[in-house]
Amino acid sequence: MLVNFSKMHGLGNDFVVIDNITQNVFLSRDQIIKLADRHFGIGFDQLLMVEAPYSPDLDFHYRIFNADGTEVEQCGNGARCFARFVRMKGLTNKHKITVSTKSGNLTLYIEKDGQVTVNMGHPNFEPSKIPLKATKRELTYIIRTEEHTVFSGAVSMGNPHCVLEVDDITTAQVDILGPLLENHERFPQRANIGFMQVISKEHIKLRVWERGVNETLACGTGACAAMVIGFIQNKLISTVQVDLPGGSLQIRWNGEGHPVRMTGPAEHVFDGQVAL
């Protein structure tokens, strides 16, 4: 069976996108892992599936699979690529696109300059919703490993995030602390780990160790998580530039009770076919 796909990226966070409306594709976990291999497959951080909506008041259903084959709740950079893909492939001509995901609904806006704004919904700081093992909600949590004690914020952006503030993003122990915290017992569903350097109240630098992927060039939900945690800790204002290794995103949030909005690029690289 030949499957049509597009390779896309958002600030270097790269995706294979499959139209599962005009095709009928089912991929096993082993097949996804094989396709994700950058030497023997296509190579990607996440695989995105475009599916028919589950509800008549939505345009599409959006599914996300990590490179390790696990289906996850949310991917912000992927959402921007999803929006560009469905327009590019003629699946819709709308500039405002509504989609369902495993963790809730998103609204995607195609901007005049070609960038995409995503209404990411409301952040959730309740430990049980992240999920994080904690007796109560805190601004900062103390998390201990055998050799390290870290102070972090935690939030769900539809998926679990832990954010650490660091003095210098270039020397942050991403490769050491990333996997330790991702798989820490206090995160029952594992977590994405952000390392945030505050440059000013409207500017941060960020590296993200993504759950099931390792460090990526960009993470949209990670950028949102870092911004909202910095905001509630009174370190950031309501509009922030987030510099990631792959480029910059603009994140806007007016505080609890309001949705987070993320704006950034979505790039098409090539189309192809793969035999399953």
From Swiss-Prot:
Catalysed reactions, semicolon-separated: (2S,6S)-2,6-diaminopimelate = meso-2,6-diaminopimelate
Q: Which residues are the active-site ones?
A: 75 (proton donor), 219 (proton acceptor)
Offer an example of a GO molecular function term for this protein.
diaminopimelate epimerase activity
What the entry lists under InterPro entries is as follows: DAP_epimerase_AS (IPR018510), DAP_epimerase_DapF (IPR001653)
Q: Where does substrate bind?
A: 13, 46, 66, 76-77, 159, 192, 210-211, 220-221
Q: In which pathway does it act?
A: Amino-acid biosynthesis; L-lysine biosynthesis via DAP pathway; DL-2,6-diaminopimelate from LL-2,6-diaminopimelate: step 1/1
Q: Which UniProt keywords apply?
A: Amino-acid biosynthesis, Cytoplasm, Isomerase, Lysine biosynthesis
Q: What is its EC number?
A: 5.1.1.7
Q: Which family does it belong to?
A: Belongs to the diaminopimelate epimerase family.
Fill in the subunit field for this protein. Answer: Homodimer.
HAMAP family xrefs: DAP_epimerase (MF_00197)
The protein's name in its UniProt record? Diaminopimelate epimerase
